[in-house]
Amino acid sequence: TYQWENVDDAYVQGIELGVKWNPFRDFKAGVNWTINQGKFKHERAEWSDPESDECKEAPQRLAYAKDSKYISRFPAMTGDLNLEYTPGTWSFALTSSLQGKMYIDYNSEDAPKTSKIKKTDTFTLWNIRVAKRFGSFSIYGGGKNIFSYLQDEKHGDDAAFMYAPVYGATWYAGVSFTL
């Protein structure tokens, strides 16, 4: 189990840039990009101290000492793209989310010798949505993760290791009404 604790030697810094733009009637665009840095000032003992209980039980953890300085699950960059076109009673949307490389701790309780710190690849998720309004009713449909990006490594015994979709594209459709 994870217990979050402020260890007093971590720092986080970054810069965020964003732009929203309406280049023509019924069309909105937005872009957001963030560069992040999050590290501990020192290597974490559970990955770097040969005398720690974790390293005594699984000495291969010591190979990840340098990577343990990175804050787990904290991407080096993130970004979003939003495009929306709404002519009359129609609505079309395309959204995207970028996740940069990050370090993820994998702590296996069943097999501690497989514990490690994984550096992920950068990935992008894409979503679409189309809707048509008929008075107070609307019909809509769309897809999430339409290119079916999946994280390349899955460990069902450690929910904290999930950093990207573990299932492919999800498609949906529906009807809504306004009172």
Residue ranges and their predicted role:
Residues 97-110, 131-179:
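C-terminal beta-signal and adjacent terminal beta-strands/loops
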Residues 119-123, 130, 164:
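Short amphipathic alpha-helix initiation/capping segments at coil-to-helix junctions
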Residues 86-87, 120, 133-134:
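Structural motif
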Residues 6-8, 68-71, 113-120, 161:
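Short, contiguous acidic/charged loop-to-helix segments that flank catalytic cores in large enzymes
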Residues 1, 65, 112-114, 140:
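A generic, residue-level signal for flexible/boundary positions that often mark functional hotspots
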